[in-house]
Amino acid sequence: NVEAVRQSLERISWVRHAEVRRRWPSSLELRIEEHEPAAQWGEGAGQLLNTHGEVFTAVMAQPVPLPVLHGPQAVAPDMLGYYREAVDILQPLGRLPRVLTVSPRLAVQLRLDDGMVVELGRQQPKVPVRLRLQRFVEHYPAVLSVAKQRPSVVDMRYPNGFALRVAAAQVHVTESKGKQ
């Protein structure tokens, strides 16, 4: 049964799609498309996102450094698009997004390879996430030149500006024992 063979092949974790054809007189022709992982999906072990934005479960034989995407599975293809745009937009800064999170309310957040978090907010027709990230790239070098510390969080959700949060400085307190 050709259909049973196809279904059996598609149950293999790395197989995205399989085509099976009967060849005369007594052979089968197989065409198999495998998943190409583009990102780790969520926090589940073995959950990956392929290049088509589809979530699948598989074990990687060798660990490969992939970005991590968290969010509602229904928006997985959009998230992959946001990630790809972010890679291109951040290129002038020499930064890469390592984690992209979309909240249940569809707010987008990036964690960059240096640990900085960039809050981008929700996708809006007048000010899409892409434009907010471009504004970050445009103004960040000037901010960095006058800032005493590199910000840990940049909040780009404001229409005409942005907010920075710097990491709290580590303070070492020593107890002095005076006269008693």
Show the residue positions of the predicted features.
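Charged, solvent-exposed interaction patches on well-folded alpha/beta domains
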Residues: A4-R11, H17-Q180
